[in-house]
Amino acid sequence: MTELMRIAALFAATALAEIVGCYLPWLVLKEGRPVWLLVPAALSLALFAWLLTLHPSAAGRTYAAYGGVYIAVALVWLRVVDGVALTRWDVAGAVLALGGMAVIALQPRA
């Protein structure tokens, strides 16, 4: 597995944990779903925080690069979970964001 693939997979897992951790409370508050969903939401957000510690860069750089992957994963969620078709603007934005992530994450280390 290349370094970019490893970083992207870790970022994708991190984004998924964050999205699930935020989506479940949204279901409780917006859709009237059972309150017990807040328990797996809290666990998912704890997993999200732990996954962030596995990234090799300084926290600020990790968060900056992570943002690009989060955008792409959120758009996949929009399509798969919410059932909303992506526009070419969604795809273009995700490509730009992932390009920015790659520049930040793969910069030469001094």
Curated annotation (Swiss-Prot):
InterPro entries: UPF0060 (IPR003844). Signal peptide: none annotated. Pfam families: UPF0060 (PF02694). The chain crosses the membrane at residues 9-29, 34-54, 66-86, 88-108. The keyword Transmembrane helix applies. Keywords: Cell inner membrane, Cell membrane, Membrane, Transmembrane, Transmembrane helix. It comes from the Bacteria. GO terms for cellular component: plasma membrane. PANTHER family: UPF0060 MEMBRANE PROTEIN YNFA. Belongs to the UPF0060 family. HAMAP family: UPF0060. This is UPF0060 membrane protein Bcep18194_A4425. It comes from Burkholderia lata (strain ATCC 17760 / DSM 23089 / LMG 22485 / NCIMB 9086 / R18194 / 383).
